[in-house]
Amino acid sequence: MKELDAKVVELLNNEPLWWIGTSGADVNVVPVGFKAVTEDGKLAVGAVFLNHTLENVATNGKVTIAAGGSKGMTAYQIKGTGKYITEGPIVDKFKAMADEMFKGQVTAKGALIVTPEKVLVATPGPKNNAEL
């Protein structure tokens, strides 16, 4: 597992959306707002509308998450392996968030937990695509 440094974690925590990309029978990229960096440095995404994403993760487990740009040019891309879970404290957290936002009409089915393996700079400039 690649440890995320403080500046990456800060950006991930402050961005309103992450973009999650997967590949399988079809490539898929979607914005996600139900997200968190876990205490152990993994990335968690609430599975509210992630049907194609979860199909692709079941195929090969490969996930890319990109975040940044809402408050400047700084951005990162995190590549890793995803695992879908349907119970536990993080799932309960996302269910509560979805219930509050959607007034019980939609809920989180589970959570996609991404173990980071590589972090790349996605900021324009000479360090673009450099691995941290």
Language-model segments: what does each one mean?
Residues 1-132:
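Binding-site signature for planar aromatic cofactors or substrates
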